[in-house]
Swiss-Prot record:
Name this polypeptide is given: Bidirectional sugar transporter SWEET6a
Family, per entry: Belongs to the SWEET sugar transporter family.
Pfam families assigned: MtN3_slv (PF03083)
Taxonomic path: Eukaryota, Viridiplantae, Streptophyta, Embryophyta, Tracheophyta
GO molecular function: sugar transmembrane transporter activity
Positions of transmembrane segments: 10-30, 46-66, 70-90, 104-124, 132-152, 166-186, 190-210
GO terms of biological process kind: carbohydrate transport
Topology Extracellular: residue spans: 1-9, 67-69, 125-131, 187-189
Family annotation (InterPro entries): SWEET, SWEET_rpt
Compartments, as annotated in UniProt: Cell membrane
Amino acid sequence: MISPDAARNVVGIIGNVISFGLFLAPVPTFWRICKRKDVEEFKADPYLATLLNCMLWVFYGIPVVHPNSILVVTINGIGLLVEGTYLLIFFLYSPNKKRLRMCAVLGVELVFMLAVILGVLLGAHTHEKRSMIVGILCVFFGSIMYFSPLTIMGKVIKTKSVEYMPFFLSLVCFLNGVCWTAYALIRFDIYVTIPNGLGALFGAIQLILYACYYRTTPKKTKAAKDVEMPSVVVSGTGAAAAAGGGNTGGGSVSVTVER
């Protein structure tokens, strides 16, 4: 019979694979930006938010905060690299006004992270306290990001059209939330359960809306249409297996869907 730790590891690895896929979801958007050498109306906000989320989860997973959390560090370390690449591309092809704003927000995030790191390491002297403080921050920012799909869901209900809510992306986000929620429940971790439970819930609602309104969606009037989805949180615990506790991957992605 499979042990709880082994089951948690398997679920965590699956969650990491799904999370990695979601981190790569905006690639078509940035491919378009590189080809046109212009960010057009796209905003850096979702990627800046994801960057902060990843930084918090990486800090949560290091041994001095939450021991044995190698998967949380690896998936969010990858997330930092991916989001950093997106932001570099965005910076290169943005007008000066957008560049200055992006740098200002990034500066605030770095100062905030420095304050969190110093405050936690100097003010909390046990793994439990450090995990609690950083975990609460991760839950807070992750939960806020999970509410962003409410806008697109409201638009679906108002227009009775799922034109701006791609089925595949909704399905993957639902599976991501379910996977990490299941992981968190194998060995209960409140900091992973809350944001991912919300993710599973909102993902399920999007799928229900899709089932209700896909038949009433009007035919496309253009050969191709670009849609910028609200941010999608990539949050989970990778083999908390490792963390004898948890591993958590976090992030949000804005994706352009070409139809």
